[in-house]
Amino acid sequence: MSFNHQEIEKKWQGHWEENKTFRTPDETEKPKFYALDMFPYPSGAGLHVGHPEGYTATDILSRMKRMQGYNVLHPMGWDAFGLPAEQYALDTGNSPAEFTELNINTFRNQIKALGFSYDWDREVNTTDPTYYKWTQWIFLKLFEKGLAYVDEVPVNWCPALGTVLANEEIIDGKSERGGHPVERRPMRQWMLKITAYGDRLLEDLDELNWPESLKDMQRNWIGRSEGAEVHFNIDGTDEKFTVFTTRPDTLFGASYCVLAPEHALVANITIPEQKEAVEAYINSVKMKSDLERTELAKEKTGVFTGAYAVNPVNGEKLPIWIADYVLATYGTGAVMAVPAHDERDYEFASTFNLPMKEVVKGGDISKEAYTGDGAHVNSAFLDGLNKEKAIVKMIEWLEVTSAGNQKVTYRLRDWLFSRQRYWGEPIPVIHWEDGTMTAVKEEELPLVLPKTENIRPSGTGESPLANIEEWVNVVDPETGKKGRRETNTMPQWAGSCWYYLRYIDPNNSEALVDPEKVKQWLPVDIYIGGAEHAVLHLLYARFWHKVLYDIGVVPTKEPFQQLFNQGMILGENNEKMSKSKGNVVNPDDIVASHGADTLRLYEMFMGPLDASIAWSENGLDGARRFLDRVWRLFIQENGELSEKITDAPNKDLEKAYHQTVKKVTEDYAELRFNTAISQMMVFINDAYKAETLPKEYVEGFVKMIAPVAPHIGEELWNKLGYSETITYASWPTFDESKLVEDEVEIVVQIMGKVRTKLTMSKDASKEEMEQLALEAIKEQIEGKTVRKVIVVPGKLVNVVAN
């Protein structure tokens, strides 16, 4: 008889909900364990089979830790602001708030149907004013610390849509919606000074138990470079510009300079004869994203301005070009070009036939740039020095002559924090008619997003909030001064930067989080989610956490102690699942046909948690068959416990059981769920062969499978005679001494060739081993003289006979 998953799963989900089985008390006697999932964006499409993979992993850990005596915090919530809801509202005329609420209800029901042990009393929703009150409060703190500021920044402007687009909304220079042209134009934006935390974000990575590959992605994104700033005067004018270089030792080899097309000096220094060409080039660049501009493989383009810079170290005049591979937002927006020793400069110089000058020996610059180390040449006071010594000496010279200085720079840019959208947290700032700007008072938070029918873009580049006159226009009650509210909203990243803190104290209206509770629960012990958030979300969350640490809100320097990226579940044909390919698997269908326990077991058994693996219906059926085997082993056709289950011990199963407890316990802790499940399958095979099943082993096995398949776990526990939930039963333990082999396999050789293998007591003496071996091969050595017998205790017997 197989089990009725629909009946059992409904029954236990109802039981858990009614009894609040997974409610986390704020007690401090037990050790704590905080298991966090990357909370989902509740899209209209609902949950897909990729979501439960990470959720099942944290759930297995949470369930095991509860049984091991930990107080477990395992929460769930919704990252619900963001573009898709706004786009849907624009397309249908419905409110994004209603759409979002509908989606959240769908997601919640789907997640509950999978049997995850979340404490639903701690649920958070980033679009709830009682939540985003504190997102706005954090913004005020950033503003007070000078970490939030306004700047003119080039953005992706789509005239047809009348709005600014994020990079991911643009495909081949056109808007994803409608395929309209997109151009770059400077606009007033809020920025967050994440660069002020660059060193700490870099250094503290060393203390984290994160995959090295992921730490490297963050290191590269932060991109710390040591070098020098060099000041260049522009010939015949009072103007000057600064470049940053990691190779100041090659300054004697500079043969031209390049400015970003948007650089403020370009208009001033371009000579009349070059004006037309320069303006045409600037216009052509407007359509390109930063990514397209800096693509290494692309053909180099540029235009000469007609102006010259003066090399401070030797007075040589260097032509000034503009080229799109130099970005105004990176470094100083200007570079000195040393084509003999830099690949990109070499390509550019080759394209435009610009001079090259060797200043480091070791390569052949007629063929390619030489970027290695070597003795300096053609470099006056640096001649003969290697790279390291030459850099130090050149920086000394720059500082003595005030032509430059030592400098550390970052690839990391400040975080562009404003969005010209309706569906986001309002930024709590007022711009006054006298040009000043103040933050909304703390006691006036939350600044609630006003309800409006009209969420069409304003067309001016401001967000749709600019259309709501009665909300935008304010008067200072004390001075009568008129002002306008900030109409930009925060990006979707904002709410997800700190949600792990709100789970700790979700209903606190007086503080973001209670200091005692946050001390108890931080840091998060394990954080599991997709690798697509490896850089931005994690970097932004770490940045906000460090700011909160500096102002005394949190007691730890880092939020997430251990991090793990799950792999992707692909379609059966190894392609990414997508609606357009028609290969999306809906978990609701699987829960109906096979059961939630089967889905959970299958996703954990597919392969290593971090691997991307193709979905397989056969694999799913196999997972269900295994659960049916477990059920049939323990439960008879009439629904009663199997008569094989007895209070008496069974020596034959002893080793297999203790081995299983050891392996499953270790593998769960190390997130090796597939091998833990394999071991449980081995045990079930052994148990089928056994005459009797000791009740202790059956109970231990049920406890081990319950974190993966909690509904069947609860039902079997109940049938074993327990009225309480299995959730807080104590985790099984193993006895090391029971794992030791009593018997060993001995290889028997004749003249070094294996003839047979024998099983004997591991304590057998040399004499016993020899006797048993000779007995086993007596036919093969008949008529031969045994010259010598070599015995290696516990391993082999080699007989020399001829």
From Swiss-Prot:
<dbReference type="InterPro" id="IPR014729">
    <property type="entry name" value="Rossmann-like_a/b/a_fold"/>
</dbReference>
<dbReference type="Pfam" id="PF13603">
    <property type="entry name" value="tRNA-synt_1_2"/>
</dbReference>
<keyword id="KW-0547">Nucleotide-binding</keyword>
<dbReference type="InterPro" id="IPR009008">
    <property type="entry name" value="Val/Leu/Ile-tRNA-synth_edit"/>
</dbReference>
<feature type="short sequence motif" description="'HIGH' region">
    <location>
        <begin position="40"/>
        <end position="51"/>
    </location>
</feature>
<keyword id="KW-0963">Cytoplasm</keyword>
<dbReference type="GO" id="GO:0004823">
    <property type="term" value="F:leucine-tRNA ligase activity"/>
</dbReference>
<dbReference type="InterPro" id="IPR013155">
    <property type="entry name" value="M/V/L/I-tRNA-synth_anticd-bd"/>
</dbReference>
<dbReference type="GO" id="GO:0005524">
    <property type="term" value="F:ATP binding"/>
</dbReference>
<dbReference type="InterPro" id="IPR001412">
    <property type="entry name" value="aa-tRNA-synth_I_CS"/>
</dbReference>
<dbReference type="Pfam" id="PF09334">
    <property type="entry name" value="tRNA-synt_1g"/>
</dbReference>
<dbReference type="Pfam" id="PF08264">
    <property type="entry name" value="Anticodon_1"/>
</dbReference>
<feature type="binding site">
    <location>
        <position position="579"/>
    </location>
    <ligand>
        <name>ATP</name>
    </ligand>
</feature>
<keyword id="KW-0436">Ligase</keyword>
<comment type="similarity">
    <text>Belongs to the class-I aminoacyl-tRNA synthetase family.</text>
</comment>
<dbReference type="GO" id="GO:0006429">
    <property type="term" value="P:leucyl-tRNA aminoacylation"/>
</dbReference>
<dbReference type="InterPro" id="IPR009080">
    <property type="entry name" value="tRNAsynth_Ia_anticodon-bd"/>
</dbReference>
<dbReference type="InterPro" id="IPR025709">
    <property type="entry name" value="Leu_tRNA-synth_edit"/>
</dbReference>
<dbReference type="Pfam" id="PF00133">
    <property type="entry name" value="tRNA-synt_1"/>
</dbReference>
<keyword id="KW-0067">ATP-binding</keyword>
<feature type="short sequence motif" description="'KMSKS' region">
    <location>
        <begin position="576"/>
        <end position="580"/>
    </location>
</feature>
<protein>
    <recommendedName>
        <fullName>Leucine--tRNA ligase</fullName>
        <ecNumber>6.1.1.4</ecNumber>
    </recommendedName>
</protein>
<dbReference type="InterPro" id="IPR002300">
    <property type="entry name" value="aa-tRNA-synth_Ia"/>
</dbReference>
<dbReference type="GO" id="GO:0002161">
    <property type="term" value="F:aminoacyl-tRNA deacylase activity"/>
</dbReference>
<dbReference type="GO" id="GO:0005829">
    <property type="term" value="C:cytosol"/>
</dbReference>
<keyword id="KW-0030">Aminoacyl-tRNA synthetase</keyword>
<dbReference type="InterPro" id="IPR002302">
    <property type="entry name" value="Leu-tRNA-ligase"/>
</dbReference>
<dbReference type="InterPro" id="IPR015413">
    <property type="entry name" value="Methionyl/Leucyl_tRNA_Synth"/>
</dbReference>
<keyword id="KW-0648">Protein biosynthesis</keyword>
